[in-house]
Amino acid sequence: MWIKELNLTHYRNYQQASAAFSPGLNVFIGDNAQGKTNFLEAIYFLSVTRSHRTKSDKDLIYFDERDCSISGTLERLSGRVQLEILLSDKGRITKINTLKQAKLSDYIGAMMVVLFAPEDLQLVKGSPSLRRKFMDIDLGQIKPVYLSDLSHYNHVLKQRNAYLKSVHQLDSDFLSVLDEQLVTYGSRVMAHRLAFVQSLAKEASKHHQAISNGLEKLSISYQASVSFEHQQEIYQQFMDQLKATHQRDFLRKNTGVGPHRDDLVFYINDMNANFASQGQHRSLILSLKMAEVSLMKQLTGDNPILLLDDVMSELDNIRQTKLLEAVKKENVQTFITTTSLEHLSQLPKDISLFKVNKGTIALDSVMID
């Protein structure tokens, strides 16, 4: 798939902007704080209905305006699709081919994206919530049912925690009802995550072998808060461990086990990547991002769109070369933001170059020397 055009109204520093893209490589160039990342963020938001930079929709609306919109035309193997998101103080509206979507799980997945931004370099050493969000975003695009299961799980979890905080004595019968619902949805979430991580690890290992010239082995471990050896055991093990922690949950007023406590651990040559060098971290994340692209292609039969937000300057020449080689091999539509073409000397000649300046964007196709 590839996005053919994007239209913004009152988004960030864009009052009104439109751009038509090529199915290959598209580069946004301009000084800092001109709107390059904002435009890339809009593509990301149109796909996953969230920003990678802020949790507040208000931050996305142009100064003094009350609403904003993002719309785009997507070319998929199955045909052309029109996507639109409207944001206002009343909430969000998502549309596919002008039809309003009642649930996020009905919308997300229509356009798949893989984002590589500087903050992704914190994925290894950052908090577990970052790694859970990483799984949620990818799985939500690949398997819409995952979002439904996760939403139901979070709803029951919120109910259970509210109950634990409100009572001075446990009602075992009522808690058992909540436990049954929590385990039903939670075991599905964990099964989805387990299968995803196993597949992702295989792809990431291949890419890391290429990037490290065969000198390093990358592995990824799914660390569920519920102990189990086989996928078939997840439901019963979750139920048993949840019941065993009733008193603990009552005293601490929260739920101690479940997918909301899950984590991922990365290993390089069988050693925890937390202790790896900065260069190894960059290679790991680069491998992970290209593995996301490969896996989405495998599991859906269509290409995702790759968004590279100012990451070329974060990579040395060798890793830049490896990234561009991987992009060329995967043959996916790619967007790059940069302040200079200096880091992009190895780009192919046939690119679409867009100049971004003070909330305006204009196409200027050039040949790179």
Curated annotation (Swiss-Prot):
- A GO BP term, please? DNA synthesis involved in DNA repair
Supply one GO molecular-function term.
ATP binding
Q: Does the keyword Transport apply?
A: no
**Where does the chain bind ATP?**
30-37
SUPFAM superfamilies, from UniProt?
Answer: P-loop containing nucleoside triphosphate hydrolases (SSF52540)
Keywords of this entry: ATP-binding, Cytoplasm, DNA damage, DNA repair, DNA replication, DNA-binding, Nucleotide-binding, SOS response
Q: Where in the cell is it found?
A: Cytoplasm
InterPro entries, A to Z: DNA-binding_RecF, DNA-binding_RecF_CS, P-loop_NTPase, RecF/RecN/SMC_N, RecF_2
One family name in Pfam for this protein: SMC_N
Q: Name one GO cellular component term.
A: cytoplasm
> PANTHER family under this entry?
DNA REPLICATION AND REPAIR PROTEIN RECF (PTHR32182:SF0)
Describe the task this protein carries out. Answer: The RecF protein is involved in DNA metabolism; it is required for DNA replication and normal SOS inducibility. RecF binds preferentially to single-stranded, linear DNA. It also seems to bind ATP.
By sequence similarity, the record places it as follows: Belongs to the RecF family.
List the NCBIfam families.
recf (TIGR00611)
For this entry, the protein name equals DNA replication and repair protein RecF
